[in-house]
From Swiss-Prot:
It catalyses: guanosine(46) in tRNA + S-adenosyl-L-methionine = N(7)-methylguanosine(46) in tRNA + S-adenosyl-L-homocysteine. The active site is at residue 143. Substrate binds at residues 147, 180, 217-220. GO terms for cellular component: tRNA methyltransferase complex. Pathway: tRNA modification; N(7)-methylguanine-tRNA biosynthesis. Disulfide bonds: none annotated. This is tRNA (guanine-N(7)-)-methyltransferase. The gene is trmB. S-adenosyl-L-methionine binds at residues 68, 93, 120, 143. It comes from Vibrio parahaemolyticus serotype O3:K6 (strain RIMD 2210633).
């Protein structure tokens, strides 16, 4: 059982406090997921330690690192890793059945350029991810906390943006977000436009077309069924 951190922010996006609990949202692992966790964790799983990772040691090469926060069941992350063997992919997901499903798919796909963690992403960022080291950070379909009184719980806040900025490679690292909630998309733009050291790479300074390298996720398919649009947003670290 791992610590999970829930952050609360004020209206200015500043961190007020961290609420810690020891509930991992375990869920029930299927036999296939449990088998994948047991078999694949030694080669693809990374245990939480409060010390910085060495990407060359983790992956055995110097290829660019793409990190995804909250990969769900991992299908799109595995597909991206399979389609881009010249990159390394690192996924963080707090829901263990999702990690098991991701490992099962990765094993079936025969990919070797993927590593996963089952832990709170903020703690991993604070203690394990080296500064200036990520080519891309992916945040796809995070919890929109659609009620206005809950907007302060959204992960995309100024404090989080600064943490992301520190981890991206200077002058080239990309923060790629996607959401099927228009209000959250507008919130992302508003926060990131305030965040120092970032530049929106969209031609109109708003949203980018859906990138071909981002696979269709179940959340996106759900959004289409509900009549929602999907918004992709990319910011580049420029300082």
């Amino acid at each position: 059982m791992s610590e999970v951190t829930t952050n609360e922010y004020n209206e200015d996006g500043k961190l007020i406090r961290k609420i810690r609990s020891f509930v991992r949202r375990e869920g029930r692992l299927t036999k296939g997921q449990e088998n994948a966790m047991n078999e694949c964790w030694p080669t693809m799983g990374i245990d939480y330690k409060a010390e910085l990772l060495d990407w060359k040691e983790v992956f055995g090469n110097d290829n660019p690192v793409v990190l995804e926060i909250g990969f769900g069941m991992g299908a799109s992350l595995v597909e991206m890793a399979k389609n881009a063997p010249e990159k390394n992919f690192f996924g963080i997901e707090v829901h263990s059945p999702g990690v098991g499903a991701c490992l099962s798919d990765a094993r079936e796909a025969g990919i070797t350029n993927l590593r996963v963690m089952c832990h709170d992403a903020v703690e991993v960022f604070e203690h394990m991810i080296p500064n200036d080291s990520l080519a891309t950070l992916q945040l796809f379909f995070p919890d929109p906390w659609h009620k206005k009184r809950h907007h302060k719980r959204r992960i995309v806040q100024l404090e989080f943006a600064e943490m992301v900025r520190q981890k991206l490679i200077p002058n080239e690292g990309i923060f790629h977000m996607a959401t099927d909630w228009e209000n959250y998309a507008e919130h992302m733009i508003e926060i990131m436009n305030q965040a120092p050291g970032f530049e929106n790479i969209a031609q109109d300074g708003d949203f980018v077309p859906r990138p071909e390298d981002r696979p269709l996720t179940k959340f996106e398919a759900r959004g289409h069924r509900l009549g929602h649009g999907v918004w992709d947003i990319k910011y580049k670290r420029i300082a």
